[in-house]
């Protein structure tokens, strides 16, 4: 194992890269994607995506091929039942589609 890779969790790093690309893409559409943390209510999606014209959605970011934990899936299902758009993002190529679905328009990113 290379010395530079000692102690590095590549799953976490890959997830972080995807998350950073999502934030950048949302900004390019005039929106924001703050980290969503809810003390006392675990399992909520990672990012709240807020786009112009009052469009919003939630995004759970995972490393490629990873699935949400059972509690995360329960929260995703709850938010969807309440009528919110909720996406699971594990591939950066899906970012334009997600932004478009939330309300960023056909030509998203």
Task: Give the positions of each predicted feature.
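Catalytic phosphate/metal-binding cores of nucleic-acid and nucleotide-processing enzymes, i.e., regions
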Residues: 1-109
């Amino acid at each position: 194992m290379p010395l530079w890779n000692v102690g590095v969790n590549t799953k976490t790093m890959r997830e972080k890269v995807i998350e950073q690309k999502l934030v950048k893409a949302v900004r390019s559409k005039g929106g924001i994607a703050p980290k969503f943390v809810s003390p006392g209510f675990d399992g909520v999606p990672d990012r709240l995506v807020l786009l112009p014209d009052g469009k919003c959605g939630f995004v759970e970011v995972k490393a490629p091929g990873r699935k949400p934990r059972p509690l995360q899936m329960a929260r995703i299902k709850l938010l969807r039942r309440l009528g919110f758009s909720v996406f699971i993002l594990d591939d950066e190529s899906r970012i334009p589609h997600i932004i478009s679905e939330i309300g960023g328009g056909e030509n998203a990113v």
